[in-house]
Amino acid sequence: RDLESPANGEWLGLAVQVEGAHRAPSFLHLQSGGQARIRLMRGDQPLLWATQLPYHDGIWLVKSLVAASPAQASVPPIDSPTLEALRGLRGEARYKAWSRYFVETLRTSPGSCLEAGRWLLRLSLAEQVPAWQPPQSHDPRERVLERWRYRSVGRDALLPDWRFYSLEKVLDDDWVQWLDWWGRDNDALIALRRVEDDEGRVKWWRKKAREGELPPVLALRLNCLDACVILDGHCRLRAGLLENVAPEILVLCAYDEQPMPVDTAQRERVLQSLAQRVDAPVRRGRRPLDSEQLNQVLLRLFDDRPWPRVLTRARAVLKEEQWCAEVRDWLAARERLDALEPIIRRVE
């Protein structure tokens, strides 16, 4: 069902209920273990290994960067008939159509991440950084990314606001990646495969970007990484980057609902304060409440909708020795054992 703002009817996202009595592991799923060890799996194939630092200073990622086969992909490649069916849609009509396309595709895809429970799809759009802010990089691709800042469409106090302050991490195609949670790496967007500028799909999407028909990128929120991983759209993101066209990002997350407690005494005090504020003469230096501000306060005051709590589910099946051995073998095969010690010791 579509979620709309109670204030102005603005589209906020798509809520999805996946039926099922038990949460069996989806094809794309997380595993966890002691010492904050994490592994993202595509079937029986690891996509990445991760481990958090003890004081939450950041997280190490070791990525396989293996592209999914068509049979394993979370979303099959978008084809021309699909693009033609959605061509020309703009604004909310476009957002709703692509949201439903991805949800319906995930429902039927063998490589899906959907499990039984509630899911939420929110759209983030790019905002331009002020022109006075100097670029930090000499790489033209990175300079484009530094100008893109994302936040979710619609303003709602209960729904998550997915903000991407920098997309530069998607250019990092090293096997090993460090996310500094005290720096600019909160809410990062993580690529799960390498993309070359001369790939056929990149060239095709560059043409669609110039036509204004570039579909959104689909990402999955993982709280344990404080980041989102790209489920579908690696080539579209690269095409948008090369054409200086910021693609929309649809962020998928699991959630549950918590009842919103109602404090009638507090509500009465706020109402009395508002009445006094409205009736009192305007004092110097104090702006009067306009009708829009007053309506916003009243809407929040009487908003008793359940609070959506974002979740990341994982199976606690990892053994410390197994995780360390896999990471060691993977790095050794790629001549990156220089990165092993800080990862195993969980230090920067």
Set out the residue ranges of the language-model regions.
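Solvent-exposed functional surfaces
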Residues: R1-Y55, I59, L237, V245-A246, ...
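Residue-level signal for functionally critical sites in structured catalytic/ligand-binding pockets
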Residues: V129, D232-R236, L298
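C-terminal or late-domain output modules
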Residues: G183-E196, P215, A219-C224, L241, ...
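A sequence-level detector for short glycine-anchored, His/Arg-bearing signature motifs
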Residues: A227-E243
